[in-house]
């Protein structure tokens, strides 16, 4: 399954389209005097004063004015959030382009690199159709108009070009995550995960290793194997390795992803309402393989491994039952008291394997692991639990620069108390209280000593209904790709 190309031709300079709108970004406290005169009625009546989110269109001159509010309050998320709608407009306009004019005050307040980068990401996400299985999608595809940027401050041109190049690459992989995450489980199976991973590896010169069921049994990966016992779709573990041509550090990062292509809950079956959303339970794995693709295409100088465990959790006569005990890859015995807490079983084996075989300096996992994290943080941030202040701080820095929000949660030893089993080394659930935290403590049992590790629970950020900042709504978001790209850059700069 190939990764789609970018949908928009984006450049810096005059728009090459025959027909296009100029999009003029305006700050409320830097409102041009000529426009105050030209649109005296609109400004006097409050129809358009440059408030954040206000839009006024001059159809005669084909100019759209977009207000961004006051300069002192401007943030990149407040700029980027407006461009999803313009991506959607481009999708509907037949070949009509957009020439975006960036005022000097904006590129002085926020770097031209960052502004162009995040606008490109928002436009590409907005234009990307997710109704790919609909008859309408197949029959009514329209030509997308060109987009260009005009900078008032010519001195910021190189910065803008850097952001444009980066945005074109990263947005493609974000949409790659969104595309496969939105496909239903009968269209995207564990085998399709292998196909997608092979294409990303082929495009970027990555080494790929696929563990099918016989290899998983040989390696005694009881966690992954136990989850798929009720499904006719066989489990996989997929490893992608990126070795930079010009490494700038010997530090190695491992990215682990949870890939449940569908999670019914198994014997501990989920409620019927919204169960269709459990096709999104593979977003952690989707992010892992697309992030390493973006990292490789950008040519970042840090060695990276992406490893994902892929399975389908279904009820069946052969399915694992509450109370069953399995032996994990690292030899720990696990009592499964709830088959709907299956993601941690998959992750445990992958964490152990990667830790033993690759000995990374930094290792993190991304997983739609617990509903409890949504109760804690809503859909605005992913929860981070880590055994390393160094890695946590690197993630915080990457979160700020990428505008993909995280929030640190505790990993105190007390949260592991209720994971004790009376028959095995550990059980897979610890009750409702602190559910995200006890889940992280479970995973910690599978991390090799000496590895700086972080667990990122993306259950609240992997998909959402409403757009917020740099995160698109109405389905999967592709959360984590920008965060991981920025994290790798931070690791490369760390001395």
UniProtKB/Swiss-Prot annotation:
Q: Where in the cell is it found?
A: Cytoplasm
Q: Which GO terms describe its biological process?
A: proteolysis
Q: Which PROSITE patterns has this protein been placed in?
A: CYTOSOL_AP (PS00631)
Q: Which domain of life is it from?
A: Bacteria
Which GO CC annotations does the UniProt entry carry?
Answer: cytoplasm
- Record note on cofactor: Binds 2 manganese ions per subunit.
CDD domains (UniProt xref): Peptidase_M17
Q: Give GO MF terms, alphabetically.
A: manganese ion binding; metalloaminopeptidase activity; peptidase activity
The family database entries (PANTHER family) matched by this protein are listed as: CYTOSOL AMINOPEPTIDASE, LEUCINE AMINOPEPTIDASE-RELATED
- Annotated function: Presumably involved in the processing and regular turnover of intracellular proteins. Catalyzes the removal of unsubstituted N-terminal amino acids from various peptides.
Q: What protein family is recorded?
A: Belongs to the peptidase M17 family.
> Protein name, please?
Probable cytosol aminopeptidase
Source organism of this protein record: Leptospira interrogans serogroup Icterohaemorrhagiae serovar Lai (strain 56601)
Q: What lineage does UniProt assign to this protein's organism? A: Bacteria, Pseudomonadati, Spirochaetota, Spirochaetia, Leptospirales
